[in-house]
Amino acid sequence: MTRYYWCDDKTKEKIEEEDAHDDGGVTPIILMTGDGGAPAMTDSVDVMDNVIMFYGEVSEKNAKLLNKALRTVDKDLQVFKVKYDSEPPPIKLHISSYGGSVFAGFSTVDVILNCKTPVHTYIDGSAASAATLISAVGDKRFIYEHSHMLIHQLSSGMWGKFEDFKDEMENLDMIMSMIKKLYKEKTNLSTRQITEILKRDKWFNAEKCLEIGLVDEIVENG
């Protein structure tokens, strides 16, 4: 089955007209398909049209899969924009993750910020730690009514010489500064408020996430 994209009747008619003259069953546009025309899927990343589901740990492996999905869908939607002279739908990124690697998270942050197609993020159930970095940079950010988010400090462990520990503290200070800067830019929180919140491991419900600017809208049930 072929899925088409359109944003208005004019574009829909144009797609259907081209399809009617197609003698080989070639579809006008298909977004990111796997073997046999099935949607591309992995354990942590599923793709269906302009919807990407990210359910898993923020790891280097999973970030690579997610970043590839974002780039592929973005590229295909930009092809659609040029071919049909119509604005494509946004990329809808659904997130359910307890977090993971801050470096992997920032890699996806940069991919989202460089997408030409708007990326809308949705919190499905929960997003914590590095996963909130990803959700926070969406062009529009949604959270479902019973979902929660958690932001907190970095965690790190190491062993070595005294100087190694000094270097590690400098590294951690640098990364924490990056995290605070992102939250400062993408929320309603002051630097002082961010510093205090990061000291705790406290979940925020949908209403609190909206209040502090982690999201833009609550998706209500029904």
Where are these regions (language model features)?
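Terminal-region recognition feature
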Residues: 1-222
